[in-house]
Amino acid sequence: HIYIFNRKISTTFDSEKQYSVIQEAKDNMKKHLLCLITTILIAASLNAQPNYNYEKLQRENLGRGVVAIRKDASTVTVSWRYLSSDPMDTGFNVYRNGKKITPEPVNAGTFYDDSYASPDTATYEVRPVVKGKETNRKNGRYTLPANAPTGYIQIPMQKPANGVTPAGDTYTYSPNDASIGDVDGDGEYEIILKWDPSNSHDNAHDGYTGEVLIDCYRLNGEQLWRINLGKNVRAGAHYTQFMVYDLDNDGKAEIVMRTADGSIDGKGNVIGDTTADYRE
């Protein structure tokens, strides 16, 4: 007799039939083994996931981030930020010029379309609501300027003056890379903008490049500072990247970039040797 898995499968010997039964048993064993391996791999992958303590993760201390943009001639879209510290059941009341314009708290999103056709200035305020009561926890405001453009926010910028290289070639400036960060700790993002000269290029090309400038602006266009990387930092995508983040967790974002002798910080201080010139 032949037994497989303690089951009697034959009392007479037939070579072809017995071969078929044995092959079937092997196939079943392969299936069981494959299932076992798959189960082990899934369990291992789950155990490999880090166990985060989200209470200890560094977070930016951000405000409500209210912004109002004219959607069309008769509508203004108001948007704001839902914070990680907000209760899950938080709703929001929206006010225009001190008058509530939402019939009930907005709880299905963080934006609201206001029917407002006047070209005049309008101040919007967003107040969080929990269990039917305004908490006044991190209310946010934004003033829509008069005759605001449709579809975007207009931010005035201080374009640098044209420059001239030692070879006598004139260059101009244009906005290039940008990032965001709360540099002053007020809970709202500022814009960090790089001005790139028109003659920027990498070391595969000879010749001079203009000085790279980096500005910081509020959304209303107020310029907080300007950094000049100086003549010893070549202008080009390979050399003038920068990073913005609150690296030391003091509530204010830092900016990290390459500098050299002659670079000027946002307060007008010159770094290193003011007379050094490494371009030759």
Predicted regions and their residues:
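Short, positively charged and aromatic/hydrophobic N-terminal segments
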Residues: I4, K8, T12, K17-V21, ...
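Positively charged n-region of N-terminal signal peptides that target proteins for export
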Residues: K26-H32
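Bacterial N-terminal signal peptides
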Residues: C35-A44
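Boundary at the C-terminal end of the N-terminal hydrophobic targeting segment
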Residues: L46-P50
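Proline/serine/threonine-rich low-complexity linkers at boundaries of modular beta-sandwich domains
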Residues: N51-E60
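Beta-propeller-forming repeat regions
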Residues: R59-N61, A73-T75, Y82, P87, ...
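Solvent-exposed loop/turn segments flanking beta-strands in beta-repeat/beta-sandwich domains
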Residues: L83-N97
